[in-house]
Amino acid sequence: KNHGFEKVSQLKLAIAKKIKEYVVGGGFLFAMCSATDSYDIALAAEGVDICAQVYDHDPLDPRAQEKLDFSKCLAFQNFSLEKNPYIYEYSNIDATRTRKLRESEDYFSLFEFSAKWDPIPTMLTQNHSRIIKAFMGQTTSFNKKAIKPKVLIMGENKHANEAKYIHSEYGLGFFTFYGGHDPEDYVHYVGDPPTDLSLHPNSPSYRLILNNILFPAAKEKKRKT
């Protein structure tokens, strides 16, 4: 209420809309873990109460699912909300609960792109490895059925039918979403100590994060005439 909102969910919606406005205006958004799907869920649910009573002291809209407007979303569509407050999940965008992979077999592969025809995906997938060890998060990976057709999948686990690393233009800007929390801590729990980055100088997953940090600086320089 100190910020002029009646509910926390209304404040979070305002933040999601401001982030979308930034991208539409030409900004670049890089997000990981639950920062990926939670934005789109908030945007699709504008004006709809999707929060269980335990969160905001009033019941959620019984028609919440059918009132979602996927046209407002950046990356996802046709997803179903998780309405049970006792299940650690927002929707079926995240594939954490449906994937049947052991840690020893949990990998994803990067697609190859042409630097001539696809310069941005080429920059974002630069790596010394094309097969990369996966990792968990509150949002681990993305159900392919929930991804909008215009969104480019740059990394996937084909066997599990899930995307790990996606990118798209939006308005005048771009966004890249990367599923999972900490690439070098397979299951990172709340309260766990931070990973010592010095122990992983050649991490292919950290390289993908670095690609996104450096991407905004990769602007074409003006040529002398």
How would you name each of these model-derived features?
Residues 32-152:
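An acidic, glycine-rich "communication" segment
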Residues 3, 23-24, 63, 190-196:
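Flexible glycine/proline-enriched surface loops and loop-helix/loop-strand junctions
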Residues 3, 7, 20, 27-31, ...:
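Conserved aromatic-histidine-acidic binding/catalytic patches
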Residues 49, 144-225:
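Extracellular ligand-binding/catalytic regions of CAZymes and related secreted enzymes
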Residues 1-38, 172, 212:
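Short alpha-beta junction capping motif
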Residues 17-19, 55, 141, 163-166:
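Generic recognition of flexible, low-complexity loop/linker segments
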